[in-house]
A protein has these predicted regions:
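C-terminal membrane-cytosol helix-exit motif in multi-pass small-molecule transporters
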Residues: 180-199, 215-227, 245-259, 500-508
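Hydrophobic/small/kink-forming positions within alpha-helical transmembrane segments
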Residues: 65-69, 99, 157, 215, ...
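A membrane-interface helix-boundary motif in multi-pass transporters
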Residues: 168-180, 227-239, 307, 428-494
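Flexible interhelical linker loops that connect adjacent transmembrane helices
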Residues: 7-11, 139, 187-215, 230, ...
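Hydrophobic alpha-helical transmembrane and interfacial-helix anchor sites in secondary transporters
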Residues: 45, 77, 165-166, 332, ...
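Helix-loop-helix hairpins in multi-pass membrane proteins, especially solute transporters
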Residues: 64, 71-210, 227, 320
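12-transmembrane solute porter fold
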Residues: 17-40, 53-62, 178, 209-211, ...
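Transmembrane-helix exit segments and adjacent C-terminal regions of multi-pass membrane proteins
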Residues: 1-24, 274, 455-572
Length: 572
């Protein structure tokens, strides 16, 4: 394969930047929508295709696996090749896979198309942020944070609502068609308005062994996390083999990266304090972002008797907090060029929000629950996107794709681990909590008369009870149990989020650049000559340090801000 060095192109106009940004945000929207729009209709889809519980699990897990595994690969390809072409390729893959999924006649074909959707989604999510760095400077990007929040809020909250409405009124197959117009418009907008520099070709080596080891190790790890406790016991031989196998594969990946000529993940990036602490923070953010959204929905359904659609609406305060606060903070970051106070405040709000959610019960005033969710959403909004921003601001421009995608990768990994771990804890706690309420349950059953036998059979079946259909005396007990059980998860997640507070406090307070990635490229920052031969990974790091092309920490002034490069434009 060939990689490239930039050749100067005319600057994009403000109108072209805004149109391209619209296309990028559409790409991000469809990648989010692909995962959320089917969530409320999956039982209908799997049943219609004559699938079982295994198929139900894999329809979800396959997309998660493909998205997570492909994210760092897309990031590396973005550093080696044509980013615009890669983004269009990801969008085209999504269009074809979504259209095909809508015509699925069995679960096997549906799962295969969901894998391709996941691969494309990983590309759209990673490449959108990388290309955004090409056309907007870190300083300028703050004022567009509200758009990110809006896309995330609409995609996350609106997806299940749209999917449920389509399934109820038309047909579940249209869930896979609904995002296609957005993807097609995104392709056209990007083709017409996104003008990135042409690149002079040079020979590079693809790290195929690294790709294979990382993909295998992460896949095994995510399958273990996603299915442990349900498909097999945590203390089983299968569990130990999967966990041990993933550790071995990932250890081999790390060893391989030291020797690779073009490593999939340049381990030298971990010498950059900003990158390292952003990765640590992102792991903990994943627990707050993904884990809490899953269990908040379960709280609404199991403890407050909401339907799946109602649960989506009831979690809107969290998305509203993310949208409103990230919009305000982004504008202030662009105006004043200061980011750290917002990020530290956000990390503290995450802990406060989780702690407050750890105090809720099944009958807590919903206004209070909404306030707690808003606080948590505000914290996530202040931290999550800014982690990508500060990393892109701090790393060498030729590692921007890898570094950006690594932050997303570790955030997803943290979210998956957090969801699996908290889910396992809930599965352990609920039976114990029900056992503690046996005397109350017996009294409630005694009031049911002829219905007692029917309710007893339902509870003894071992399946998750439909809380809303239970008689009120029994329903209140189960709502109380699930309310306290889910609240206990938030109480556990709160101290985990202290990791984010520590990590963001340790981030170097570097000044935001006023140059885009394209401008940095055109100045020759971080670029080896086009004719430079590939070098061995370990020796290559030393060579880059000697040549000054490996940036382990941005130059800093006495107050911790990085100095402005000569020739950098002033202002925002």
């Amino acid at each position: 394969m060939t990689a490239t060095a930039p050749v100067a192109q005319p600057k994009m106009s403000h109108r072209e930047i805004m149109q391209s940004l619209t296309g990028l945000l559409m790409g991000m929207f469809v990648s989010i929508l692909a995962g959320t729009v089917v969530s409320s209709s999956l039982p209908v889809i799997v049943s219609d295709l004559d699938g079982g519980q295994t198929a139900f699990t894999w329809v979800v897990t396959a997309t998660l696996l493909a998205t997570t595994i492909s994210t760092p690969i897309w990031g590396k390809l973005a550093d080696l090749g044509n980013r615009k072409l890669l983004l269009q390729l990801a969008l085209a893959m999504f269009v074809l896979a979504s259209a095909a999924a809508g015509f699925a006649q069995n679960t096997e074909f549906l799962i295969a198309m969901r894998v391709i959707q996941g691969l494309a989604g990983g590309g759209m999510g990673a490449l959108s942020q990388i290309v955004m760095a090409d056309i907007l400077s870190p300083r300028e990007r703050g004022k567009y944070m509200g758009l990110f929040g809006a896309v995330m809020a609409v995609g996350t909250v609106g997806g299940p609502l749209i999917g449920g409405f389509i399934t109820d009124t038309i047909n579940w197959r249209w869930n896979f068609f609904v995002a296609l117009p957005f993807a097609v418009v995104a392709i056209l907008l990007i083709q017409r308005t996104l003008h990135l520099p042409a690149f002079a070709k040079r020979k590079v080596k693809i790290d195929y062994l690294g790709i294979m080891l990382l993909s295998s190790g992460v896949a095994l790890l995510l399958i273990w996390m996603s299915m442990g406790g349900s498909q097999f016991g945590w203390n089983s031989t299968t569990s130990y083999l999967m966990a041990g196998g993933s550790v071995v594969l990932l250890a081999l990946f790390v060893l391989t990266e030291f020797k690779a000529a073009e490593p999939l993940l340049n381990l030298g990036l971990f010498k950059n304090r900003t990158f390292t602490f952003a990765v640590i923070a992102s792991l903990a953010i994943g627990v707050s972002m993904f884990g809490t959204s899953v269990f908040l929905s379960q709280y609404m359904i199991m403890a407050r008797g909401a339907t799946a659609t109602q649960a989506g609406l009831m979690t809107f305060p969290m998305m509203a907090g993310l949208l409103v606060i990230s919009t305000i903070a982004g504008a202030l970051i662009t105006r004043f060029g200061k980011w750290k106070a917002f990020v530290v405040t956000g990390s503290i709000l995450q802990v406060v929000g989780l702690f407050l959610l750890g105090t809720i019960h099944y009958d807590t005033n919903f206004v209070l629950v909404g306030v707690y969710m808003f606080i948590l959403g505000a914290g996530v909004g202040l931290v999550m996107q800014n982690m990508v921003l500060v990393v892109q601001n701090a790393v060498p421009v030729n590692e921007l794709g890898v570094a950006s995608s690594a932050v997303n990768f570790f955030r997803t990994l943290g979210g998956t681990a957090g969801t699996a771990g908290l889910g396992a804890l809930l599965a352990i706690n609920i039976p114990n909590m029900i056992a503690d309420r046996q005397s109350d349950l017996a009294k409630a059953m005694a009031t049911l008369g002829d219905k007692a036998a029917e309710v007893s059979a339902q509870l003894a079946s071992g399946s998750l009870p439909s809380i809303s259909t239970l008689p009120e005396p029994v329903r209140v007990i189960f709502e109380s149990v699930y309310g306290d059980g889910v609240a206990a998860l938030f109480a556990v997640a709160a101290p985990i989020s202290l990791i984010t507070v520590v990590a963001v406090c340790l981030l170097p307070n570097q000044k935001l650049r006023t140059q885009t990635a394209v401008e940095r490229h055109q100045e020759g920052e971080g670029q080896a000559p086009a004719s430079a031969p590939a070098v061995d990974g370990a020796k290559g790091l030393e060579a880059q340090r000697a040549e000054g092309t490996l940036l382990t920490e941005a130059p800093a002034t006495a107050d911790g801000d990085n100095e402005k490069k000569p020739g950098s434009p002033a202002g925002a």
